[in-house]
Amino acid sequence: MSELEQLRQEAEQLRNQIQDARKACNDATLVQITSNMDSVGRIQMRTRRTLRGHLAKIYAMHWGYDSRLLVSASQDGKLIIWDSYTTNKMHAIPLRSSWVMTCAYAPSGNYVACGGLDNICSIYNLKTREGNVRVSRELPGHTGYLSCCRFLDDGQIITSSGDTTCALWDIETGQQTTTFTGHSGDVMSLSLSPDLKTFVSGACDASSKLWDIRDGMCRQSFTGHISDINAVSFFPSGYAFATGSDDATCRLFDLRADQELLLYSHDNIICGITSVAFSKSGRLLLAGYDDFNCSVWDALKGGRSGVLAGHDNRVSCLGVTDDGMAVATGSWDSFLRIWN
């Protein structure tokens, strides 16, 4: 037996030992614990608004913290800020690169950010004295595409990239202050914890990781998916998170139990998941799929409670407002829909 084979076997044994140790701590399943709970019943949501204006596939959207404005990014090379109440466009920002994959709204509402195949995170100031929107900072440094970005505040932003790393940036200086390394595949998505002290990432190595923003260390790793993880989203409590993968499943992982609690899948669903988000209470998990639909799952019992159907192409992104009153879905059909 070659030395490499021996090392592979040792690694496999260690992996099994870790899994056994995790299982030993698992004294009950979520299905058992929630068996006495009522199911949420059928969830029926209607499209209340359709936001028309993009001329090509929409790749990303993010709600502002006022639960009214949202930003969307499209292959047409535009970043649009929408008023979801009136469907008016507040700003249409032409981008230097039309190959945009992510966008983010700052908590203050003063800035939006975007990035993609240009490997750069571009920050735009919405509140300039002149009234026009302009690039206030460009953050180059990643050696792969930018897959996701989220503001901590007006001065800091976290990015994930196809170069297998995530990074914390000081926007003022334009420098990476922390680099988060540990994934062995493209990092596709990140989600900030409610207390903004940690974040979780999902990657093409089929694993998700919990990172400490303060010291840059990976605190926990979670496996179980058998294909790329495209989306991650923290549970509102901050003690769990959901993932969506190309293996056609969503999974719920618990940080304190250090393991997977629940799998969300259906025999009829054989396509990948592009995006996931929880309702404000955490009882519902919404997931966008390649088959043009968005499924609504009972997050605690694991059953499918509804489907949001209406897009004519892949649902590429979705988000729930901070006040929990509406869901937005964005699609390759070039439209955004607001549901409740």
UniProtKB/Swiss-Prot annotation:
GO terms for biological process: G protein-coupled receptor signaling pathway. Gene3D superfamilies: YVTN repeat-like/Quinoprotein amine dehydrogenase (2.130.10.10). The modification Phosphohistidine is found at residue 266. It comes from the Eukaryota. The modification Phosphoserine is found at residue 2. One of its GO terms (cellular component) is myelin sheath. The modification N-acetylserine is found at residue 2. The keyword Repeat applies. SUPFAM superfamilies: WD40 repeat-like. Keywords: Acetylation, Phosphoprotein, Repeat, Transducer, WD repeat. PROSITE patterns: WD_REPEATS_1 (PS00678), WD_REPEATS_2 (PS50082), WD_REPEATS_REGION (PS50294). InterPro entries: G-protein_beta_WD-40_rep, Gprotein_B, Guanine_nucleotide-bd_bsu, WD40/YVTN_repeat-like_dom_sf, WD40_repeat_CS, WD40_repeat_dom_sf, WD40_rpt. WD repeats lie at residues 53-92, 95-134, 141-179, 182-221, 224-263, 268-307, 310-339. One of its GO terms (molecular function) is GTPase activity. Signal peptide: none annotated. Guanine nucleotide-binding proteins (G proteins) are involved as a modulator or transducer in various transmembrane signaling systems. The beta and gamma chains are required for the GTPase activity, for replacement of GDP by GTP, and for G protein-effector interaction. Belongs to the WD repeat G protein beta family. G proteins are composed of 3 units, alpha, beta and gamma. This is Guanine nucleotide-binding protein subunit beta-4.
